């Protein structure tokens, strides 16, 4: 990964690891605890007990919203903790907004998502409509909204195919990063 970054082949790669092992409790209880300790507007739980699999997800990020022929994604990149009081919260927020590295990474992600939506949107319709800090129970994030108008013959499924997987969970440029992740997972 580091060599690819130094060579300029990719700019950022978000790499996760798989964990397998005994939980010691029912996975749905873990999901309920996650929902209490890290409430997020987009959460989900799927269990296939016969396969021994469970998936719990909790995210504040909107990958895709479609409505009346318009598409929107709200990428998140840049994080600070919540403050212990309003003054500290404000200081941490200002630090996040003015951090050059965080802003550069966020801008890179917004550009990636603009490009992805551009694949399925009418020419000239894709634009960034919002840039702000959103506060959640434990952290605050830089969040933007990128919007477009679906091109003729395109629908939400086409938009999902263009955006998936989301740039905030892969990195940039997406095709190179996804190939690198595939190689690392072999």
Give the ranges of each region predicted by the language model.
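Extended alpha-helical targeting/anchoring segments
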Residues: 1-186
């Amino acid at each position: 990964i580091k060599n690819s970054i130094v060579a300029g082949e990719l700019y950022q790669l978000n790499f996760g690891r798989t964990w397998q092992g005994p939980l010691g409790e029912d996975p749905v209880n873990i999901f309920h605890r996650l929902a209490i300790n890290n409430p997020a507007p987009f959460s989900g739980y799927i269990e296939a007990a016969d396969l021994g699999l469970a998936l719990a997800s909790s995210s504040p990020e909107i990958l895709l919203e479609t409505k009346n022929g318009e598409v929107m994604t709200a990428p998140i990149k840049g994080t600070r903790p919540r403050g212990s009081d309003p003054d500290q919260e404000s200081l941490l927020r200002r630090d996040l907004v003015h951090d050059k590295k965080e802003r550069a990474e966020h801008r890179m992600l917004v550009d990636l998502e603009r490009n992805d939506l551009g694949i399925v949107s009418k020419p000239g319709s894709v634009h960034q409509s919002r840039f702000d800090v959103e506060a959640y129970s434990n952290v605050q994030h830089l969040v933007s909204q990128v919007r477009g108008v679906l091109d003729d013959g395109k629908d939400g499924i086409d938009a999902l195919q263009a955006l998936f997987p989301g740039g905030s969970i892969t990195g940039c440029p997406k095709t190179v990063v996804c190939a690198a992740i595939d190689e690392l997972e072999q």
